[in-house]
Regions:
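Hydrophobic alpha-helical positions that pack around
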Residues: 185, 219, 223-332, 338-344, ...
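Ferredoxin-type iron-sulfur electron-transfer modules in oxidoreductases and energy-metabolism complexes
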Residues: 373-388, 398, 402-470
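Conserved mixed alpha/beta catalytic, RNA-binding, or beta-rich assembly cores of soluble enzyme
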Residues: 87, 150-163, 173-205, 215, ...
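Acidic low-complexity segments
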Residues: 105, 110-163, 172-174, 229, ...
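N-terminal, Lys/Arg-enriched amphipathic/low-complexity engagement segments
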Residues: 21-71
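Short, positively charged and aromatic/hydrophobic N-terminal segments
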Residues: 8-20
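Short histidine-centered loop motifs in beta-beta connectors
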Residues: 68-77, 81
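Conserved hydrophobic positions within beta-strands
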Residues: 101-103
Length: 470
C-alpha cells in the first residue's frame, strides 16, 4: 500500500487543503504486450451448467503427467466419478467418468493440438449415478492424506500445463514453500471464466487456496489484475469471513500479457527469477489457478473428482458467448447450436485456448479436457492474415520478451540447425507466450518456430542420453 500526500489550493478562499490518499501498489514485470482484451463479450454473463445434448462424452485417457492405461473396456457400465484410466507412475493423475452410462468405445480421437490420442467414449444414461469419495476435513487430516485426496481426485492444473497438483504441492524435502500464489490475472484476451468464478463463488476459491496453504505451510497471495479491481472487495470480504486476513494477501498486478504466466507472476510479485532449466518451486513459490482451487475445495468438501470443466466460449463468430461448466469430454461440436450459436460463414479460425497460446483446430470435433479454459470462434477481422516477410531486424520481439530472450536470434540459430547456439540463447527457457509473434511487424511465427526448435533440442538430448547409456 502506497500513501500519497497532496496539497490542494482553493483560490476563492486563498487556502490550502492537505490530502492523504492510500493507493495500492501495482506489481509488474519488464516487457510483455497489451493486446485488445475482448472480454466484454462474455464478462457479464453468468456461469451456467450444461450437459452435452447427445449425452455422449469422449474423455482423453491422459490429461497430465505419465500415460494412463484404461481400467474399463467397451461395454462396461460406469458411474459418474468412477476411475476409468490410471497409472502407477508418481507424476500422473487418474481420469474419471464424467457421466454415468456405458463405455461405447476406446480408440484414437482428435484432441486439442490437432493430435489423435487414446480416448474413452461414454454414452450417458441420464441417471446421474455417482461414485464420489467421502468428504474429508482438510484442516484435520495429515498432509499425506490431503495429497492422496488430491491425487485420487485427478486434479491437474487448470491454467494450461495440466501438471498433477499432488506432485506440485509435494516438492523435495529441502525445498521450503513460502507462498501459494493464486493466479487470478486471467491475462489472455477473451477468457473470462476465472473472473466469473471469482465473482460468483469466491468461497470455493478461497477455501481451495487455504487447503493448499495448509498442505504446504505457506502463506497465500492472490494476484489480481488491475482491470478486475471490482473483485477486490468481494475477495476481501470472503477472506475476512474465513478469518484468514493474516495469512492471505491480495496484490494488484498490471493488466498486460503474459502477466498470468507462472514465471512472470513470481517476478512481478517477489522480483525472483526461476533459474534457467529450473522450476518455479525453487523460488519458494507455487502458482495455482482459480479453477484448480475450486477443484481442490470440491474434492474435500464434496468428495468430487475433477470431472467438470468451467470455460469461456466466445469470439466474433460466436453469436451467443457463454461461460459454462460442462462434463470433461464434452465434444465442442455437440454444443452447437443447442448451447451456443455459431456463424459458420464468418468463422475463419477455431481455437482451443486463447488467441496467443491456444491451438488452431481443424475441426470442432474435439473434447473439452481438464485444461481447456476457452474455445474461440474468430472472424477474419480478429485474425492476422498478413503474409510472413523476412525479419526486418527491428528488435521489437526482444523488447517485449518477458524473459529477456532474443527470439529472432534463437530462430536464426534454429534455421541453420545450430542447436547448441539456440540452447545458449535460452530456447528451452521460452514459455511460448507468443508476445514476440504478436508484436512482429514481419508476421514471423516466432513462437511456432521456437516450439519446433524446442522439440528438436529435446530429441537431441534424448539421443545423447541414449548414446551415453549404450
Amino acid at each position: 500500500m502506497n500513501i500519497l500526500f497532496f496539497f490542494i489550493y482553493f483560490p476563492f478562499t486563498n487556502s490550502l487543503c492537505f490530502v492523504k490518499i492510500k493507493v495500492m501498489k501495482t506489481y509488474t514485470f519488464k516487457g510483455g504486450v497489451k493486446p485488445q482484451e475482448c472480454k466484454e463479450l462474455s464478462k457479464d454473463i453468468n456461469i451456467c451448467e450444461v450437459l452435452p445434448p447427445s449425452k455422449t462424452v469422449t474423455i482423453p485417457v491422459t490429461m497430465g503427467g505419465a500415460n494412463n492405461v484404461p481400467t474399463v473396456k467397451a461395454g462396461d457400465k460406469v458411474v459418474k466419478g468412477q476411475i476409468i484410466a490410471d497409472s502407477t507412475e508418481f507424476i500422473s493423475a487418474p481420469v474419471h467418468a464424467s457421466p454415468s452410462g456405458t463405455v461405447k468405445e476406446i480408440g484414437l480421437h482428435l484432441v486439442s493440438g490437432n493430435l489423435k490420442v487414446s480416448c474413452i467414449t461414454i454414452e450417458g444414461d441420464g441417471l446421474d449415478s455417482t461414485s464420489y469419495m467421502e468428504p474429508l476435513d482438510p484442516f484435520n487430516c495429515s498432509s499425506k492424506d490431503a495429497l492422496k485426496r488430491i491425487r485420487d481426485a485427478g486434479i491437474t492444473g487448470q491454467g494450461g500445463a495440466s501438471f498433477p497438483l499432488h506432485v506440485k504441492l509435494n516438492p523435495p524435502a529441502n525445498t521450503e514453500i513460502k507462498y501459494i500464489i493464486l493466479n487470478a490475472a486471467e491475462c489472455e484476451p477473451y477468457i473470462t471464466i476465472d473472473y466469473r468464478t471469482l465473482k460468483e463463488t469466491p468461497h470455493r476459491v478461497i477455501d481451495g487456496l487455504r487447503i493448499m496453504m495448509k498442505i504446504t505451510g505457506a502463506k497465500g497471495v492472490i494476484a489480481l489484475e488491475d482491470n478486475k479491481i471490482d473483485l477486490l472487495e468481494i475477495l476481501k470480504a470472503e477472506i475476512l469471513k474465513e478469518n484468514c486476513s493474516q495469512d492471505i494477501e491480495i496484490r494488484i498486478v498490471k493488466s498486460k500479457y503474459p502477466q498470468g504466466s507462472e514465471k512472470m507472476l513470481i517476478k512481478s510479485l517477489f522480483n525472483k527469477e526461476v533459474p534457467s532449466g529450473g522450476l518455479p518451486v525453487e523460488t519458494g513459490c507455487i502458482v495455482s489457478n482459480t479453477g484448480t482451487a475450486c477443484a481442490v475445495s470440491d474434492a474435500f468438501r464434496l468428495g468430487k473428482p475433477l470431472i467438470e470443466r468451467a470455460l469461456t466460449i466466445s469470439g466474433g463468430a460466436c453469436e451467443t458467448p457463454k461461460n459454462i461448466i460442462v462434463p470433461v469430454g464434452t465434444i465442442v461440436s455437440d454444443l452447437v447450436p443447442e448451447v451456443v450459436k455459431i456463424n459458420a460463414e464468418k468463422t475463419v479460425k477455431l481455437l482451443s485456448g486463447g488467441p496467443l497460446m491456444g491451438s488452431s483446430m481443424i475441426s470442432a470435433d474435439f473434447p473439452i479436457a481438464k485444461g481447456t479454459a476457452c474455445v474461440l470462434f474468430l472472424t477474419k477481422e480478429e485474425v492476422n492474415t498478413d503474409p510472413e516477410i523476412p525479419c526486418i531486424g527491428c528488435g521489437k520481439c526482444i523488447d517485449v520478451c518477458p524473459l529477456g530472450l532474443a527470439p529472432t536470434l534463437i530462430v536464426s540459430a534454429l534455421k541453420v540447425r545450430n542447436i547448441e547456439k539456440a540452447g545458449k540463447l535460452g530456447v528451452m527457457d521460452c514459455v511460448e507466450c507468443g508476445s514476440c509473434g504478436f508484436i512482429c511487424p514481419a508476421n514471423v511465427p516466432l513462437v511456432q518456430k521456437i516450439r519446433l526448435g524446442k522439440a528438436n533440442v529435446k530429441r537431441q538430448m534424448a539421443s545423447k542420453t541414449a548414446g551415453g547409456k549404450a
